Amino acid sequence: WTKGLEKAGYATGGSYASNLQKIIEVNGLDKYDRMVMENMQSQGKEFGVHNAQGETQTKDDVKYSFPVNREEFMLVTSPFGMRQDPLDATKQQMHKGIDIQTKHEAVLATEDNGKVIAVNQNANTPGGKSVTVEYQREDNSKIQVSYLHLDAVDVKVGDTVEAGQKLGMSGNTGTRTTGEHLHFGVKMIAADGTERDMDPAAYLSDIAIKGNINLQALHNGNNLLAKYQEAEKTEGQAID
């Protein structure tokens, strides 16, 4: 997990992870981690690093993934909702997605059986190079997941994609960006055709629960998924 902190951008030096690990070991602070892992192993369970990295097999043989590969958490630089326009401080705008910190890396499909319904290869548009993947639900509703400001796109319209499959590379393309990041947007389309933008944190919370993915989406130290996960737990307890 120390390397997770370093990769996420919290480290201030190249030897951050190794130095922190030495401090933990010298003071015997790793004994609690060992106790937890030994207890899990005695129960036939595996430590959850592979789950945290996104591709997770579930009972119904459907996989789920986060849009980027992380060991413990991903950093969100701008959440869903009203915000100051990053290109004009005098204006407010509705941010219809979340901005995820990236470093020229693969962006991934979040579910199995997704259909690529849109690809934009024009870097000089507001969202730059982008991909939209649609997932059909049993009630005939649909979820559309979009990835903006990409450096490269690896799929084409009509492709079927699976969870964890690389769709392209993150980047800084587009006329409405101030630095590299992944703008991750989610739209829900009801069976009657009604559309609405939803908080991607709510969608990722659902993905995390279904796929048993132990990752956080941190913005200013707060896990954006927590309120949605707590709501689902409360709802489940009420049904029970």
Region spans (language model):
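Soluble non-cytosolic domains of exported or imported proteins
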Residues: 10-18, 102-105, 141, 176
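Acidic, glycine-rich catalytic/binding loops that coordinate metals and/or anionic ligands
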Residues: 55-64, 159, 185-239
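A residue-level detector for short acidic-glycine micro-motifs
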Residues: 78, 102, 118, 149-152, ...
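Sec/Tat-exported extracytoplasmic proteins
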Residues: 8-13, 24-31, 80, 120, ...
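Surface-exposed, glycine-biased beta-strand/turn segments
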Residues: 43-129, 163, 176, 224
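Catalytic cores of secreted/periplasmic lytic hydrolases that degrade extracellular macromolecules
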Residues: 1-56
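Zn2+-dependent peptidoglycan hydrolase active-site motif and core
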Residues: 93-96, 110-157, 179-185
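Active-site-proximal beta-strands of protease catalytic cores
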Residues: 114, 158-173
